[in-house]
Amino acid sequence: MSKPDEYLSSNSVPLPPQDADVLTTACDYCIVACGYKVYRWPVGKEGGAKASENALGADFPHQMMMGAWASPAQHNVVSYRDQPHHVVVIADKDATVVNPGGNHSIRGGTLAEKCYNPSNRTRERLQHPMIRVNGKLTPVSWDLATEVMADISQYIIAKYGEHAWAVKSHSYQYFENVYAITKLAMTSIGTPAFAWHDKCSATNDATGLDDAGIDSFASSYEDWADCEVAFLSGVDPYETKTTLFTSHMMPGDKKFVFVTPHMTMGVAWSVKAGRGLWLPIIPGTDTVLHMALARIIIENDWQDQPFIDKWIANSWEVDSGYGRGTRNTGWQWRTTWGTWQSDWQDYRKFILAQEESKLDVAAQITGLSADDIRTAAEWIAKPKADGSHPKTSFMCEKGNYWSNNYMNSASFASLGLICGSGNRKGRMISRGGGHQRGGLSAGGNSEWLSPEKYPGRRKKSFNLDLWLMEGNIRFAWVIGTTWVAAMMGSNALEAKMRSLTAESPHQIKSLDRAAIFETLKARVDSGGMVMANSDLYPVVPVGTDFADIVYPVASWGEDNFTRCNSERRLRLYSKFYDAPGEAKPDWWIVQKFAQKMGLDKDGGYSWKDSNDVFEEVARFSRDGVLNYHPLAEKAKASGIKAQELLRGYGTTGIQTPIRERGGELVGTVRLHDPDNDWGEIEGSTVHTKALVAFNTHSGKAILLKSPWQYAGWIQFYEAIKPRAAKGEVWVTNGRVNETWQSGFDDRRKPYLSQRWPEGFIFINPEDARKKGIESGDYVEVVNDTVYIQTGQPQGVLDADLTFNQLMADGHIKITTGRFKTIAVVSDEMRPGVCQANFNVPSSPANAVVSAVPDPMTNNYRYKLGRGVLNKVGESPYKHNFTQMSLKPRNIV
């Protein structure tokens, strides 16, 4: 008898008949977004083994690995129009972009298994709206759930103000949904209490790139194919952007410089192939590495001087376009403030004057070999025999900007710029990306109505975590995210949420609408909080323990949706089966609630389908790099729906921003490229400077300095480093290839849930030996000094938001954080550094990370956890090899 969750392999899959429905979509997971085809046909019918008898057009059996075939993980049975249907979801073998020939990752290779099927663990999907009665979630109607929420929301907004009504939301689950959510929160209600899933505030990620004038997703996949050297900071594209790496980066003979404390599979492969250099850096010290590399380049005159002369702003150009007004927004005052701003001459002097840029000093701070640093500088910048510079592209991700947010990303941008990268083929500077780009906001800018201020009383985005910890939120709607596990100081955040919700004496006792209102009114008036949660599955602990109202959400495959990947390629994600039960997409839920709130009097929430939302969003895309307005206008002129016009582009899609040339829609391969031929402006085309130049007033990039001793950084860094006397190690976190985000789908997929049934942490053998830890042991990680920022500190003087001053002013609280996980002991980790699995709700690694934002950006330093490792027993997987492989990841 097999266990309920045990993976049982199958050796057969039904073939789609010739008349099967064929729809296109893209992968729901990583930012690469490989193109897929969905074959759908009624149960009771199958195709034959001959090519003429099946929709795949192939003879079976065959031995073509990259040919047309489906594995058991690519098949499921779903409901379509209330009738059982087979679906096969396979990578598009005819694809010529993104995943040529049908290449894909293990994540995309199991897409079919995410579809709802009551015969497997997807039966755990939320299917009905629910209200928590006597501690138990009870199914109710959509009307009652939204009326209850509207009743208490109207009361809270009227008595406590819109800032007491909060939203914590995904930023990527399709244009239609994100637009609807932001329209409600930022425009209709106008609350500043809003934050994205991965941040405590509605901020940008790699702010240093933004300030330099570089769009985080300026590059195309062909740039990563065409470069001769890839400098990869805080990222292994194989693990997290698999097809970008295997289809576009591995072919050829390009070299790879990996800056990460973890030798993941991509790193190990490149080193073994003689094409890689691994720089196992101490977390948070990338800025010093960048300065040391820049110094070597400058001292040897390897910089791309013609590029610098043409494309780097001088001191006058840095200040151009501002007039006499207050530099109030972040990018304005940061790029015109002497600590960071520079031109080429000033930057050169700065680099040569920094003690930390000296090779021996940098090697000591970063923990790297001086020889390796020198080799990296040669690879990325040393001119060839003919005098030409290597075509180097620079990619950063979370290991870079989520450790020292502003300085790492700013110094990274400057390093790339002096190497002549940023706006030409094969020589780009970009993020690698995490999730796909499904965020288009309705605007409103209410997030700037924050009680906090940057130094000089400049406006600062709203810190939702801090606002909650201070007890200022009376209602919070959590949409598609694991708020607790994803944020810093997770244990303290969870405890505060629990005290405001589940531990309140005011709990719903019946489904009488009036009684519910009185109960929730009493709770909020006594300082408590009401919570609602929209998601696919019950989310620990927000949905399972705290939420008073829970909404079931329809997502990938259950409605027509749109979004872009990391090269801004827009595609339609086709609906191909029925959502379970009464589950509805976010846009529909928002609309239902808005109507109950009386916010639809102008017809602003009267969408009939997702296409209505898509067409409305189009005009809000016009001023950005995701502009698809010309497509919507062309569809309107042709008398068809915009989503249907996009459907015709299949898995190829079209790269935004979209423009018209000769009456045809044309995509944009890369941004900032002066070779982009825009010609005359046609139709609804919007021509912005960032398409042919850098995104600054002058169109030239800004070189940013990054002084290691900047008080806003160094004081925090010294406070949170591992303490040798306590036996602490760095505790960072990251992803592995097989899983996605919090594992919300993976836990319901038989093979993947068996491969990774629980959270895990990679530990170097030296660190494990000291604690008697072996692979398969349960380990508790404890940090007895987790710093939590409190209050709403006002920045007047430059020093006001530095760590020491916050501590002196009583704005830092000290707590303890801990999480339990399973050890994987391997030399793939640098000694003194452990890496826990990212965002596991039952094992939140962020519990040991301090919740003190970067004072320059208001972003957390997610990767800088620390803790003591304590063995607490053996897991059931230590001696049972049917589950959870404990093999290292640097085996290639």
Curated annotation (Swiss-Prot):
Annotated site location: Involved in charge transfer: 105
Q: Does the keyword Oxidoreductase apply?
A: yes
Which intervals of the chain are annotated as region Disordered? 431-452
Location comes to: Periplasm
Cofactor binding mode, per the note?
Binds 1 [3Fe-4S] cluster per subunit.
Q: Which UniProt keywords apply?
A: 3Fe-4S, Iron, Iron-sulfur, Metal-binding, Molybdenum, Oxidoreductase, Periplasm
Q: Where is the composition biased (Gly residues)?
A: 431-442
Pfam families from the entry? Molybdopterin, Molydop_binding, Rieske_3
Residues where [3Fe-4S] cluster binds: 27, 30, 34
What EC number(s) would the UniProt record show?
Answer: 1.-.-.-
Provide the GO MF annotations for this entry.
3 iron, 4 sulfur cluster binding; metal ion binding; molybdopterin cofactor binding; NADH dehydrogenase activity
Class of this enzyme: oxidoreductase
Cofactor(s) listed in the protein's UniProt record: [3Fe-4S] cluster; Mo-bis(molybdopterin guanine dinucleotide)
Question: Cross-referenced InterPro entries, in alphabetical order?
Answer: AioA/IdrA_3Fe-4S, AioA/IdrA_lsu, Asp_de-COase-like_dom_sf, MoPterin_dinucl-bd_dom, Mopterin_OxRdtase, Prok_molybdopt-oxidoreductase
Q: What is its main location?
A: periplasm
A single cellular component GO annotation: membrane
Family statement drawn from the similarity comment of this UniProt entry? Belongs to the prokaryotic molybdopterin-containing oxidoreductase family.
Question: What is this protein identified as?
Answer: Iodate reductase subunit IdrA
